[in-house]
């Protein structure tokens, strides 16, 4: 397919071009600076809890008639998800740039908690924008953000989800950029955000590669859920050059593709511009952004990071979907068989594995990125069970 622009880019209003360019220049000068890298490595190790383990799940593998399966345990990081990798990186960058205030958007609440945590660690003021609908379904994380000293601002415009929270955060940044850094939570937005977030999250694949080598394995298949795409691109990054390793991203199939209630950008979307970048996007024939649905707040976003668009069109990675129902089934299965409660986001990746496991050679090695833990989802799932919607 021919495109009018490369994936990514900087599609921003004039008022935001200055802060975006400033950030881009600062990132170029700091990303390979030894002091910055050493400080980040130290805080990831001594504060966030890296490296995270690689756990083989034999009971789960046996139950689904699968091969050898390992989980990359980002759920065991401080704050319970991969989001802290990026939040600490960006907040440390902001501090080096002399910023005193951090703003962020959040959907599932994990990026909000991670950003509030990083701000607490580094002594920065923190404001979090969150859709009113997401606040309702992610109350535990809202309580955590408040406890950590963040100001949580409810966004009541539009669909009241992640897209609308991003809009409000961008408005804030346009007014306050001299003192404020916008800590974007996924590998999307205007350049340099996708590159920056990928860099901070690539510690995941770096560790997986080393951990598998230590036990004498190389992976045949990597599976990760894809919302904006930061956990997946970080998990894939160091394996992209090795074409023997199959990469699979799993989008939110919601109530099913045919229902129209989903967030499957590659399945039914087409390239367009949203929030400053060009990538695959759910839109109607007039180019208006379509509403999305997922049981998982973290996957409920109408666009996907540009790195994934490149991987999709080149054929280096394949992208599939898991429905709400399939994700719930995977959530319960892992919890009961392994004593590990996954986030609903990560459960989409597990659902895809359950679907394809019988077709995989028994000697193959599969790694699933367990991007977060499911504590934040328990109230929502309990309510679904009470309502009889888990059938």
From Swiss-Prot:
The keyword Chloroplast does not apply. Its EC number is 4.2.1.20. GO terms for molecular function: tryptophan synthase activity. Pathway: Amino-acid biosynthesis; L-tryptophan biosynthesis; L-tryptophan from chorismate: step 5/5. It comes from the Bacteria. The modification N6-(pyridoxal phosphate)lysine is found at residue 83. InterPro entries: Trp_synth_b_CS (IPR006653), Trp_synth_beta (IPR006654), Trp_synth_beta/beta-like (IPR023026), TrpB-like_PALP (IPR001926), TrpB-like_PALP_sf (IPR036052). One of its GO terms (cellular component) is cytoplasm. Its cofactor is pyridoxal 5'-phosphate. CDD domains: Trp-synth_B. It catalyses: (1S,2R)-1-C-(indol-3-yl)glycerol 3-phosphate + L-serine = D-glyceraldehyde 3-phosphate + L-tryptophan + H2O. Keywords: Amino-acid biosynthesis, Aromatic amino acid biosynthesis, Lyase, Pyridoxal phosphate, Tryptophan biosynthesis. Pfam families: PALP. The keyword 4Fe-4S does not apply. The beta subunit is responsible for the synthesis of L-tryptophan from indole and L-serine. Tetramer of two alpha and two beta chains. Belongs to the TrpB family. This is Tryptophan synthase beta chain 2. It comes from Chlamydia caviae (strain ATCC VR-813 / DSM 19441 / 03DC25 / GPIC) (Chlamydophila caviae).
């Amino acid at each position: 397919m021919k495109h009018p622009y490369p994936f990514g880019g900087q599609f921003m209003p004039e008022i935001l071009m200055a802060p975006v360019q400033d950030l881009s220049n600062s990132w170029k000068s700091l990303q390979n600076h030894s002091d910055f890298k050493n400080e980040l490595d130290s805080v990831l190790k001594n504060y966030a809890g890296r490296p995270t383990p690689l756990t083989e799940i034999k009971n789960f593998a046996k139950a689904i008639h699968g091969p050898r399966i390992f989980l990359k345990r980002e759920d065991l990081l401080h704050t319970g998800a991969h989001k802290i990798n990026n939040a600490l990186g960006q907040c440390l960058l902001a501090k080096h740039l002399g910023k005193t205030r951090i703003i962020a958007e959040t959907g599932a609440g994990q990026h909000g908690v991670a950003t509030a945590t990083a701000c607490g660690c580094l002594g920065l003021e923190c404001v979090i924008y969150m859709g009113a609908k997401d606040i309702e379904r992610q109350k535990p994380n809202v309580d955590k953000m408040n406890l950590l000293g963040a100001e949580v601002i409810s966004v009541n415009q539009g669909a009241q989800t992640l897209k609308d929270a991003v809009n409000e955060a961008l408005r804030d940044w346009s007014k306050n950029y001299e003192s404020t850094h916008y800590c974007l939570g996924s590998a999307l937005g205007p350049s340099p955000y996708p590159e920056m977030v990928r860099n901070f999250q690539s510690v995941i694949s770096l560790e997986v590669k080393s951990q598998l080598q230590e036990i004498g394995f190389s992976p045949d298949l990597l599976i990760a859920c894809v919302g904006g795409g930061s956990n997946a691109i970080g998990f894939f990054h160091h394996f992209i050059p090795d074409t023997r390793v199959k990469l699979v991203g799993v989008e939110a199939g919601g109530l099913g593709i045919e229902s129209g209630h989903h967030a499957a950008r590659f399945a039914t979307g087409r390239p367009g511009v949203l929030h400053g970048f060009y990538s695959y996007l759910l839109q109607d024939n007039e180019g208006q952004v379509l509403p999305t649905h997922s049981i998982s707040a973290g996957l409920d976003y109408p666009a996907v990071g540009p790195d994934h668009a490149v991987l999709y069109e080149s054929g280096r990675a394949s992208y599939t979907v898991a429905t709400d129902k399939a994700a719930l089934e995977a959530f319960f299965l892992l919890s009961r068989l392994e004593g590990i409660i996954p986030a609903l986001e990560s459960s989409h990746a597990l659902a895809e594995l359950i679907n394809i496991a019988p077709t995989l050679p028994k000697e193959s090695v599969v790694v699933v990125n367990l991007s977060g833990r499911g504590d934040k989802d328990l109230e929502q799932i309990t309510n679904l069970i009470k309502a009889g919607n888990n059938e």
